[in-house]
Structures are given as structure tokens and as C-alpha cells.
Amino acid sequence: MTEGVLPGLYLGNFIDAKDLDQLGRNKITHIISIHESPQPLLQDITYLRIPVADTPEVPIKKHFKECINFIHCCRLNGGNCLVHCFAGISRSTTIVTAYVMTVTGLGWRDVLEAIKATRPIANPNPGFRQQLEEFGWASSQKGARHRTSKTSGAQCPPMTSATCLLAARVALLSAALVREATGRTAQRCRLSPRAAAERLLGPPPHVAAGWSPDPKYQICLCFGEEDPGPTQHPKEQLIMADVQVQLRPGSSSCTLSASTERPDGSSTPGNPDGITHLQCSCLHPKRAASSSCTR
């Protein structure tokens, strides 16, 4: 069974990748196939094929950047990406964990705990866990150097945990609500998805009177991507857009105002004011937050 990890990002196995009913229901547009002999199976799907065996010594980390960019590009363009290996346990979970680490700033253990809340069988092998540890450490060091190099030049607001967790909280808790509302809470999971997400992300803010979450939600996580620049000098960093959340009184809808301004101060092509307004539903009202963070 395909499991939604974040809006636009799904985790499953080889059978899920061939299940036309599931693919259609989840509106899958992109698939990452990561196993020994990945092959494109459907004409209307964009594939990324990564031939990797599920053994601890395999350097799966070298595929992180390609996979992260593939997923990110898919989601930024409104698509839905399924990441699958043979059983949906180790290889695909490793890739999804690396992606969520990149766009939220969370450590791999926290991300894996959140994934297990919706897919209890998720379990990267020991070698892949070690590579996730190394990836997280290297990313944090790059982020620290990047922020230090910016202090004497352009503005670079410090990264705050509240900002980094904002999108993750909305996505994880909303996904958990949908799973509970549809009665699909995973068996053998000690905590419900919602309880596990709340334990990971902390208690939600006070819920205003009249707040009525709608399980049939549609959420877009708002991320900005740095200009890749000249081909000979590609930039590797992904940055989270400034996000402001405003609750609409008496409804479950809120407006996300996401600034897609680049680090150099320019705006995204085709969006001169640098602001994108998206409609979504979420579990809890959020206070407006505006900050930037780099990974």
C-alpha cells in the first residue's frame, strides 16, 4: 500500500508502482524506482531509475542529490512523486528520509520516526542509516559555513527551528488526520500517526473556537530553490521559502504567502513580486512567521 509522507510525496513498493488504481487515485506523475533492475513501466509517468542493491556497503548517498532534485522539482510544479524499491522498506525509505531532512532541517532519526508513524515497516539497513547520519552532518556543516559567509554581505536571517518545522508540522499532522479519518491507522504502530507526529513536533498551538479540520485537504509545501547558476558552477543548496500562515476565521482553510525570493535578492522568473499565494487546509492555526533558512 502506497503511503503519503508529505503532500506530493509517496512511499511504496514494486507492486504499488504498477497499481494503476493507486497511481491514479494519488495522481502520481513521477516515480523513483530504486532497486536492482528498475525499468519504466508506464508511458504517462516520468521516471528516475536508480540501480541499487539493498546491502549496507552500497554507497546510496551518492544518489541523494539527484533524487532530492527530482522530488523537489516534481512537487514545486504541482506533481506527485512515488519513491519505491522492491519491498518499500529500506532503499526507498532512505531516499525519502534524505529528502525530508533536506527541506525541513530535521535529523534522520526524527524523520524516520515520522515516516514510521504512517509506514511502520520503514527500516533502512544499518549501512544506509550510517550514510544518512553522514549526510545530515555534512549538510549542517555546509549550512553553517553558508550562513557565516553571508554575515558580512547580503541579509541572511538565522535559521530558527520554528520556521524549519512549520511546513513539516502542517504536512505531518494533516496527513495523520486524513489517515485517522479514513480509518487507515497502521497496525502494529504503538502510537497513532497523529500522536507520533505531535510527539515529534511538539504540542500544537491552542485551537481556536469553531476550528473544524477538513480531511479532504489540499496542502502545498512552499519551498524556494536557488538559481542553479551557470552550468560550470551549479549551486547545491535548497532553501525554504519565507512562509506566512493566516487562518481564515470559521473555516479550515488558510492562506500560505510564500516568498520565492532568491538569496541574491532577485525574484523567481515569471513572479516579479516574489510572492506566491496558495490555498490549503491544515490542522491548527499558525501565527504568522517570516524567516529564511538554508541547508
Curated annotation (Swiss-Prot):
May dephosphorylate MAPK13, ATF2, ERBB3, PDGFRB and SNX6. It is an enzyme of class 3 (hydrolase). Residues 251-272 are annotated as: Disordered. This is Dual specificity protein phosphatase 15. PANTHER family: DUAL SPECIFICITY PROTEIN PHOSPHATASE 15, DUAL SPECIFICITY PROTEIN PHOSPHATASE DDB_G0269404-RELATED. Its main location: cytoplasm. Highly expressed in testis. Expressed in brain; up-regulated in patients with multiple sclerosis gray matter lesions. Keywords: Cell membrane, Cytoplasm, Hydrolase, Lipoprotein, Membrane, Myristate, Protein phosphatase. It is found in: Cytoplasm. The gene is DUSP15. Belongs to the protein-tyrosine phosphatase family. Non-receptor class dual specificity subfamily. Residues 251-270 have a biased composition (Polar residues). It catalyses: O-phospho-L-tyrosyl-[protein] + H2O = L-tyrosyl-[protein] + phosphate; O-phospho-L-seryl-[protein] + H2O = L-seryl-[protein] + phosphate; O-phospho-L-threonyl-[protein] + H2O = L-threonyl-[protein] + phosphate. Transmembrane segments: none annotated. One of its GO terms (cellular component) is plasma membrane. One of its GO terms (biological process) is positive regulation of ERK1 and ERK2 cascade. Coiled coil: none annotated. The keyword Membrane applies. Its EC number is 3.1.3.16, 3.1.3.48. InterPro entries: Dual-sp_phosphatase_cat-dom, Prot-tyrosine_phosphatase-like, SMAD_FHA_dom_sf, Tyr_Pase_AS, Tyr_Pase_dom, TYR_PHOSPHATASE_DUAL_dom. GO terms for molecular function: phosphatase activity; protein serine/threonine phosphatase activity; protein tyrosine phosphatase activity; protein tyrosine/serine/threonine phosphatase activity. Residues 1-141 form the Tyrosine-protein phosphatase domain. It comes from the Eukaryota.
